[in-house]
Amino acid sequence: MFSFCSGLWRRNWAIFGLHFGIMIYLYSVGADDMGITELAVLRWLHIIAMVYWLGGEWGVFNTSTHVINRKLSMEERRRHMQTAYHIDILARIGIISLLPLGLHMGHLWGVQPYGGNFLVAVWVLAAAWLTLCISAYFYRETDTGIQLTLWDERVRFVLIPVMVIASISSLLGHGPFNVGPMQYWFSIKILLYSVTLMIGLKLRFIMREWTTLFRVLAEGPNQEAENQLEKSLALGKKLAYFYWVTIASVAFFGATKAI
């Protein structure tokens, strides 16, 4: 009975989320921008990426509670950890996809002046980053997976300062993005997106630590490993609240373009 109710609850929320997403999409497109256009398709993909990003992070947040539950068997805890990884990969794909989609749409809106070869390079590099991220997911419980995850993190170490500098420089009027009446929103959105990458990077550290700690726990009970697991998850949950607020802010500026 509980399983049925739980499934019904998840289905109702999924239906609500779908209706809400369609409503936001129609509101943001407007009556004068209907039809299958390049911008409309990119916006549709952007909405899907945003939904999986935010929804995926919520799923990981709830599933992770069972990972540190000492009352559960190691097998069950490991199963919950695997579920968290399965959900998280969708969020990772979403957050990476938002970058090329946003830069491409920004060019069509006239707030990001670089098109042509620049956009081609952005899409190629984003595809390479996605390949790296997905490969790390498939090899997540091996040494190869850990190394791939480290390379994924190195990409973020390079990308984050580049985006922070570019967005702040643009807000100060020095480019590379255009600013003016009703154009500041794009640079603000890029800055907030870079903040989410910072938080996400720390959450990546936490999930990578899970793999290491579960290797220790697989050898037998270990109080120190259990304590560290609980400590890291407690920090992750605190970060998650700020993460959601920042994600919502990114969506707000993207939808309203109010500044």
Ranges and model annotations:
Residues 26-259:
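Polytopic transmembrane helical bundles with strong interfacial aromatic enrichment
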Residues 8, 12-15, 106-111:
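Membrane-protein biogenesis/insertion across secretory and organellar systems
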Residues 5-8, 15-16, 21, 138, ...:
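Extended hydrophobic/Leu-rich segments
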Residues 2-5, 13-41:
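Short, strongly hydrophobic alpha-helical membrane anchors
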